Structure formats: structure tokens, C-alpha cells
Amino acid sequence: MMQIPFTRIFKVIFVLSTIVAVTDCCSSRILLLREHTLKIVQHQHSHMHEHAHELQQQIQETAVELLNRLELQRKQLEASAQEEADQLHPDTDPNPDSGGQLPNADDSIAADPEQDGIILGSSTDTWLASESSTPITDSETVTTPETVTHTGEPPPDPSSSSTPDSTTPSPNDKETEIQMLPCSEAYNTSFCLNGGHCFQHPMVNNTVFHSCLCVNDYDGERCAYKSWNGDYIYSPPTAQRKVRMAHIVFSFPVLLMLSSLYVLFAAVFMLRNVPDYRRKQQQLHLHKQRFFVRC
């Protein structure tokens, strides 16, 4: 029967298990260090955002207080100006004798009947004259708003004005079509940040201008800024959680794959001497047959 070298098998298993243990230990230590570093960086970013938020609140409070002070000063100035105007121009009756003169005029009119007829005739004449002149003034007031421009310039002469087709260019002449083409793979992966979509615009002299279509309230040439209480603050792209994926990759599946690979190598190492063993067994069997035949 075939003698299996158990000592060699144990040596191979020990060496392979040592390699697996060292590999797993080193990978775990590296991943823990990376995770700790990422946590420190994220803590620093969150601290910076909190500090920026506090500064923004302080700036808003200072601005509101300053506006209140300015409004109070303006009201005080208006009140003082009103008091000075009241002191310079006191309330007085400009025509104190007008009330006393009216009864005298009525008495004089009632005393002279001939003057009443003259006054009535003159009033009818003035009323007719005003009635005849009223349509003219109405027509003037109606046409005035149509001719006055916003700049105060006189209206243009209708005879000198030309057709609008010959003087004013059509708005379609000023419109230019902008081509938006998708970017190359290198720009798609690295140019636009925070999930932005990259586009390229062909320019003159065979040059290409790249732009980003931002999402999630990001702004900027490369979508690197985000609105924070009305202001745009630089917000770098968040690091992807590759540590968790690395933990999964370098844990049980990798160990299983390495173990299978090591077992395969051990099987190849152990079974490569099988043909020699079989050849020896066959030779021994033939030798026994010859011995029995001779006997």
C-alpha cells in the first residue's frame, strides 16, 4: 500500500495556515488604520462645517443689529427734521380777514340789483367759454400720455420713421445654438464632483470647453460648492466607504479562496509522486509473478 508522508502534510498545512494568519492580520491592521484616518478626516470636516455655521449665524445677528440701529437713527433724524420744520413754519392762518370780508361782499351784492344782472351775465359768458374750451383741453390731456416717452425726449416724427423690418434686427439673429456633448470617460469620472454630469462644448480652434450640470444644490464650475444657509461653502466630495468593502473582500471569502488554493497546491504536491509509486508497485508485482513462474 501507498505510504502517506503525514509529516510533510503537517508541515505544508502549518506553513499555509501561518501565511493565511499573517495576511489576515496585516490586512486587518491596515484597514483599521485607514478607517481611523477617515474618521479623523470626517470629524475635521464636520467641525469645519459647524464652525462655518456658527460664523454665519454671528454674521446674520450682527447684520440684523446693524440694520436696526440704522433704522432707529433714520427715525430719529426724521423726527428731529420734523421738529425743526415745525419750529420754522408754525401753523398760522394766512388769511385771517377772509371770513369777515365775505359778509360785506354779500351785503354789497344784495344792495345793488343792477350789479347782480351784470355779474350773472358775465358768469354765463365765462361758463359758455369754458364749456367750448373744455373739449380742446380734454383732447390735449388724452393725447399727451401717448406722446411723452419715459426719457423725456420728444416723440419721433412719423414721417421720418422707417419700417421696423429694416431697422430693428430680429431676435432670432442674436440667438446662438450651444452644443452640449457628453465628455470622455476620463472627464466623466474625475472632472465633475459630488455626482455632477459632465458636458463638453466644442469651441473655435479645435478647443473643447468642459462644464458640469450639478445636482443636490451643488454649484460651481466643478460642483465643489454647496448652499449653506444662503452662502456657498466649499464642500469636497465625500470619501466613499471603501473600508467596509475592503473588510468584506479581505475577510471570509478571501480566506476561503486562499485556503482552497493552498489545498490545491498541497494536493498537487502530494499527488505528483503517485505515478512513480504505481510504477514501483507494478514492477514489484511483475517481479513476484516471475518469481512464482520460475518456482
UniProtKB/Swiss-Prot annotation:
Topological domain ranges for the Extracellular compartment: 27-247
Cited PROSITE patterns: EGF_1, EGF_3
Compositionally biased region (Low complexity): 140-152, 159-171
Swiss-Prot/TrEMBL keywords: Cell membrane, Developmental protein, Differentiation, Disulfide bond, EGF-like domain, Glycoprotein, Membrane, Oogenesis, Signal, Transmembrane, Transmembrane helix
GO terms of molecular function: epidermal growth factor receptor binding; receptor ligand activity
Limits of the EGF-like domain: 179-224
Bias (Polar residues): 124-139
Signal peptide positions (record): 1-26
Keyword Signal: yes
Disulfide cross-links: 183-198, 192-212, 214-223
Record bears the keyword rRNA-binding: no
Domain of life of the organism encoding this protein: Eukaryota
Compartments, record wording: Cell membrane
Location of the region described as Disordered in the Swiss-Prot/TrEMBL record: 78-111, 124-175
Tissue specificity annotation: Expressed in nurse cells and oocyte up to oogenesis stage 7. Specifically accumulates in dorsal anterior corner of the oocyte during stages 9/10, at later stages expression is seen as an anterior ring. In stage 10 ovaries, it is concentrated between the oocyte nucleus and the adjacent oolemma. During vitellogenesis stage it can be detected at the oocyte surface, especially on the microvilli. It is also found at the microvilli covering the apical surface of the follicular epithelium and within follicle cells.
Membrane topology type: Single-pass type I membrane protein
Subunit structure: Interacts with cni.
Role played: Critical for defining the anterior-posterior and dorsal-ventral axes of the egg. May signal directly to dorsal follicle cells through the receptor torpedo (top). During oogenesis this signaling pathway instructs follicle cells to follow a dorsal pathway of development rather than the default ventral pathway.
Protein name from the UniProt record: Protein gurken
